[in-house]
């Protein structure tokens, strides 16, 4: 996959950031995206030391004009789009169903579901014309498991997995692959915001058969695989990387 043109949304932190570094180390040309200009430019500068070619393009995945411009600028910069990692996401408001509101639902779904829908729409526009490409969406173990206290987040990730599988079926004949990675608890700011306390994190770890949280690089490695030709026969796959949570 070396020298491929790759776009990563939600690249400024967590899994998206780890994926950007992992893909750059493979020699790929990368465009990283997020909502914060200063942090994005700093990330792109770091990546240039690895990839040689790395650019930051500011975009809010909830806004279609931003997403269209992001994809178009990526293609203008590199001439094509070989892979895309849709990592932008939010944990939403923690708490039971009875404490959720229309606003908390919309805030979570706008980023986690609409953002991926719009990203895939415009990535696929380019990839189908090329008749090649790979998209990897970042879901969650809670995209196929329930979790008390994160109902809206879980529902949004269930939707991501449905979008992934449906899009994969729609475009497979064009030579484009769509898959997802489903992490378990990963050592990120999102996890710390969700668990809130050391006790909360310990309770979550107790649900993981491996008895530890994962590292962003462990998810990034799976993303690199799904982006690459080594996963050429993987279509509509949701790859669980969750320390065994999905095995039970």
What do these predicted ranges mean?
Residues 125, 169-173, 232:
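Alpha-helical segment proximal to the catalytic Tyr-Lys
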Residues 98-117, 132, 136, 160, ...:
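Catalytic Tyr-X3-Lys loop
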Residues 140:
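Residue(s) in the substrate-gating loop at a strand-loop-helix junction
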Residues 12-13, 36:
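Conserved glycine-rich cofactor-binding loop
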Residues 161, 182-193:
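Short, flexible catalytic-loop segment of classical short-chain dehydrogenase/reductase
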Residues 120, 156, 164:
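Active-site helix of classical SDR
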Residues 68, 91-106, 129, 149-152, ...:
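Conserved mid-core segment of classical short-chain dehydrogenase/reductases
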Residues 91-94, 145, 224, 235-248:
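Short C-terminal tail/terminal secondary-structure segment
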């Amino acid at each position: 996959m070396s020298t491929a043109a790759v776009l990563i949304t939600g690249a400024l932190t967590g899994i998206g950031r780890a994926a950007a570094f992992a893909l750059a180390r493979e020699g790929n040309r990368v465009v990283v995206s997020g909502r914060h200009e200063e942090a994005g430019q700093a990330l792109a500068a770091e990546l240039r030391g690895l990839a040689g070619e790395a650019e930051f393009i500011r975009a809010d995945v909830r806004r279609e004009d931003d997403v269209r411009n992001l994809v178009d600028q990526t293609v203008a910069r590199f001439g094509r789009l070989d892979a895309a990692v849709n990592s932008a996401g939010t944990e939403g408001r923690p708490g039971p169903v009875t404490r959720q509101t229309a606003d908390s639902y919309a805030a979570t779904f706008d980023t986690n579901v609409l953002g991926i829908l719009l990203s895939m729409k415009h990535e696929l526009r380019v990839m189908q014309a090329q008749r090649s490409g790979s998209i990897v969406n970042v879901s969650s173990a809670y995209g196929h498991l329930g979790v008390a206290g994160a109902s809206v987040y879980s529902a949004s990730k269930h939707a991501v997995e449905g979008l992934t599988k449906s899009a994969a079926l729609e475009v497979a004949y064009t030579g484009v692959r769509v898959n997802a990675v489903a992490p378990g608890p990963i050592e990120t700011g999102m996890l710390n915001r969700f668990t809130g306390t050391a006790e909360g994190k310990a309770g979550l770890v107790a649900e993981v058969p491996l008895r530890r949280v994962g590292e962003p690089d462990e998810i990034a490695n799976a993303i690199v695989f799904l982006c690459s030709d080594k996963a050429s026969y993987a279509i509509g796959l949701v790859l669980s990387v969750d320390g065994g949570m999905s095995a039970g």
